[in-house]
Amino acid sequence: MTLSSRAISLAASSALRSRLLSLPPACRILSLEPAFTRGRRSRPAIYQPEGIRLYSSGNTSEALQKFKKSLQFPSATCSFEQLASQNQDLNDQRVVIHGYVGARRDASKNLTFAELHDMSLGSTVQLVSTPTKGVDGSDSPHNVLRELREHSPVAINGTIKARKAPSAGKGDSRPGLITNVEVKVDDITALNTFPDDIIMAKDTVFPPEQRHLQIRNDDSLRNALAFRSKAARIVRNELCDEHSFTEIETPLLFKSTPEGAREFLVPTRVPGLAYALPQSPQQYKQILMGSGIPRYVQIAKCFRDEDLRADRQPEFTQVDLEMAFASAEDVMRTVEAVVRRLWSELLAYDVPETFPRMSYEEAMSKYGSDKPDLRLGSEIRRVEYMVPVDLVSKIGPLTDPIVEVMKIPISEDANETRKFVGTFMDSPEAQPFIQNPHGQPGIFIFDSRKPLQGLQVFGFEAAEQVEEMLELEDGDLVVLQARPKEDFSGGSTPIGNLRLALHKAAVKHGYLRAPEGFAFTWINDFPLFSPSNDSEPGQGGAAGLAATHHPFTSPKTAEDMDLLLSEPLSVRADHYDLVVNGVELGGGSRRIHSAEMQELVMREVLKMSDERMKDFEHLIEVLRAGCPPHAGLALGFDRLIAVMLGKESVRDVIAFPKSGKGEDMLVKSPTKMTDGQMETYHLKLRA
């Protein structure tokens, strides 16, 4: 039984367990060496059968008195902002301020200087202490301050004194340091103590199990959470005040419906019945459109039981909106206004009035991705018509494939480019491309000192065409890749993934500068349906098809409608994704607002069974009751904040993220169900 990362497992010895339980609580201390954790000194762990660990076995009366005193601490009468205001009227005033004790310097037995950090840990003022009696006759505040450990929370009763600011270039230039005044300590109320077994320094690295200390010790995490709060406020103000949206909360206990992703089920005490946590508020917001709500918005919690990556969490937050009597253009213009305001107010960055549009087909053709990073350049071109047949056979086993080429300008020195290629191909990042069943990439380096500039395998004519097409210069990396001659499906192609991997490696090794700025684009004209994927649940129809996004998306045009039954894979969706710097910030669509049409798509195109159709009866009924045309979108809020702050992982902008295995390492969730819980919810584990 693991109590924590510092506790000792007692499961191996029932005899030891029995002896421990027979001892008084204060004696149940293990002298065995505890497990190692970063950021802590070793200390014994205390076992309690109820699962509670005691950190002290001191005098109970003393503990009660300490806590009683902390209940009576004085209210703050002055803020750090007021202290920093250069207001001379504050001098010699008695104030109460709250904060955390910082570094202390004992100048002598009778003179101590200490830092006091404000509640947000963003500002610091100097405390000055000399021996006195407390205002209530208690022990000397001077002694209390000298005994308190750094990071302990306190209430300071003191007098503001003017302080001569240090000369330019000679003083402490730390951000938030108040230099115009200091506070002479008259009394101090210790509100808690910071334990001596936790070592907190600027360079201390705390593990996820100590997320509270990560946040406390890392101002970038605290700043990200504050930034996130401001962004949420701006989103609400822009949509509700400027665009007349109504913020509405939708239920978290929903029902299981086959929308495309795996769900989390919540069992009930009624045998066989369970709720499902919503993948998104999609159906509820469409129901609101049929309820006479013209514009809905919610900063919503959503849940998906899917594979985790840097930009995925099992629970996540999205800015969810829907508009009645609206088209895709209406939604996109509204979202552009929100994005402009966010970037303007939080980053002082000018975003274009409107964002460019690019079809799914164009994005996949030019960049090998449906969320292209336009800042990288390196557009992909088709060249199978000019590449010799023997070269095609050398780069893969495919017969009559599509062959694509791109260039990446690594270095002006061809030898440096060769060195980079060797390093990359030997790295783990290259393995997916080396093991591609459709063939490895052909990699060439343009070098004017070589025959045909290093492109001799292309033959004279093709080498000349490729040089002119790509505008090649010495040191440019030329990549050739074959793929099956099929329509695009999914989110990327091998050469598109290689484009990103090579750029990332080139930046890492100093050959290219990291891309800067923000490049926004809308990706539209997605296929409405895709072939079923065994790794995803889809909608459970029998047609071998799945809705590419969800089954409520409308075909784009009348021409697409004509193909719905005869050529469903050729139908374009009225769907649009907002992409910036290779990240999909969000996606939306115009919805099917007709009950007959919605039923046709589910029953006739996807071939859902009658049982599956019953899962959507509520929505069909809402659409039948005169639901107006409507469209909407959801912005991934965690992802949006990460992109704005330049973070690689959404975990850096979430207070308590899950690990790559979906675990909360601090609170140790998820937990194993007990036999009692299993019995309550009528569950059994299959062997």
Feature map (PLM): residue ranges:
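Class II aminoacyl-tRNA synthetase catalytic cores and aaRS-like
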Residues: 2-687
